[in-house]
Design a protein with these regions (language model features):
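Conserved, mostly hydrophobic/aromatic
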Residues: 27, 54, 84, 122, ...
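Hydrophobic faces of well-ordered beta-strands that scaffold small-molecule active sites
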Residues: 66-72, 118-120, 151-155, 185-187, ...
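Mobile, glycine- and charge-enriched loop segments
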Residues: 66, 87, 139-143, 147-162, ...
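N-terminal pre-triad scaffold of radical SAM enzymes
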Residues: 49-93, 98-123
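Helix C-cap/helix->beta junction micro-motif
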Residues: 61, 145-149, 221, 254, ...
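Conserved Radical SAM active-site core
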Residues: 93-228, 233-242, 246-249
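Auxiliary Fe-S-binding modules of radical SAM enzymes
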Residues: 1-43, 108, 245-372
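Conserved short loop/turn motifs at secondary-structure junctions
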Residues: 38-41, 71-74, 124-128, 231-234, ...
Length: 372
């Protein structure tokens, strides 16, 4: 992107940063080396200037609109064949905390929601009981009953699992599910796109390259996807830059990513969290700097999301001044964060979200993942 933007209101204290900021202002693409340098900034004045710059870039690229959605989360099952060390969600067969819902039961969950919803977000464990036939039926039932509700469903991990379960290429699986009603794909399963880190988090799951291949296939079929980055576990600042680079490269090729989300690892109720209490986290990059550098580096992404239920409302609102332009959703029925003890006691409906956005001097826009 080569858009010229006005000078930010704050200038960095460190002299060598000023020409870098000016280069960004003039539309020069941020390099991996410079992205790493920005992530490692520690001086308060430099940090404030970085966040301010990202806010100005956001304003130039996408204006003052802040998106939000009314989302119902559906979880067909949490039984899973994988043993991901960072996961607080999964259960093994026979575990009393496990569950399984039929497509009809999930349709009833939608019917019981009192607030209007714009989309359903569907993810589950990887288990033979939730196969291609199951999801084809589920999506078809939802679209028949609620044709205007956007279906955002299944991560790259689940599509790879369905491929191995049925011995059918992912492209064919995506085609079948798109015909059944699939509208977009969430970004889960990315974590950090560096295989040595992925092997620590989830041994035996798909590689970074395979994750990107599945998203590329979806893009080629006209299915937009989200992308995520999970931070504060075993990743280094260099790994963060590698992750952003790989996403930017695929976006240059396909333009199929609709949104980028930074997630904070929850170190409660999982094996990795217990380890990290002894080992510590390998960096102390402020979340606002992660958002700011992501906005500057991902110059081909329009929408960056601040997950208020992950960050807390106050921090999420700060993110809106560091490059974010999406406050996520109402998160009705959300369980993954809740089971990781990350759930915040505050509940937001669509009116509450709109009011918060307006108080920041921004323009609220209710939407779904079809548009952002």
């Amino acid at each position: 992107m080569t858009t010229t933007i006005p000078h930010p209101p704050l200038l960095p204290k460190t002299p060598w940063l000023r020409p870098l900021f000016e280069a960004i202002i003039s539309g020069e693409r941020l390099s991996e080396e410079h992205a790493l340098q920005l992530l490692l900034l520690k001086d308060d004045e430099d940090l404030q200037a970085l966040w301010s710059l990202a806010d100005q870039v956001r304003k130039q690229r996408v204006g003052d609109v802040v998106y939000y959605s009314s989302t119902l989360y559906l979880y067909p099952t949490n039984f899973c064949t994988y043993n991901c060390t960072f996961c607080s969600f999964y259960a093994k067969p026979g575990d009393p905390k496990g569950w399984y819902y039929t497509p009809e039961q999930l349709l009833e969950q939608i019917a019981q929601v009192h607030n209007p919803i714009t989309e359903v977000h569907i993810v589950a464990g990887c288990t033979p009981s939730c196969d291609l036939h199951y999801y084809t039926k589920l999506f078809s039932l939802i679209k028949h009953a609620y044709p205007d509700v956007h279906i955002k469903a299944l991560t790259a991990i689940e599509y790879a699992y369905l491929e191995s379960l049925h011995n059918i290429p992912v492209k064919e699986i995506l085609t079948i599910l798109k015909e059944a009603g699939l509208d977009s794909i969430p970004g889960g399963g990315a974590e950090i796109l560096v295989d040595k880190v992925r092997d620590l988090l989830a041994p035996g799951r798909i590689s970074s390259a395979r994750y990107l291949e599945i998203h590329k296939t979806a893009h080629e079929l006209g299915i937009p996807t989200n992308s995520i980055m999970l931070c504060y576990h075993r990743e280094t600042p260099e790994d963060i830059v590698t992750h952003l680079k790989l996403l930017r490269e695929l976006q240059d090729e396909t333009r199929g990513f609709k949104n980028f989300v930074i997630l904070k690892f929850a170190n409660i109720n999982n094996a990795l969290g217990r380890r990290l209490k002894k080992l510590g986290v390998p960096h102390a990059i402020p979340p606002r700097s992660l958002m700011a550098v992501s906005r500057l580096f991902l110059d081909n992404f329009l929408n960056l999301k601040a997950m208020w239920n992950y960050l807390g409302i106050e921090e999420a609102l700060h993110m809106l001044s560091c490059g974010a332009n999406d406050l996520s959703s109402t998160h009705q029925g959300e369980k993954v964060f809740e089971m990781a003890s990350l759930g915040y006691p505050v509940k937001l409906d669509i009116e509450g979200m709109a009011n918060l956005i307006q108080k920041q001097g921004r323009i609220p826009c209710l939407t779904n993942s079809k548009n952002v």
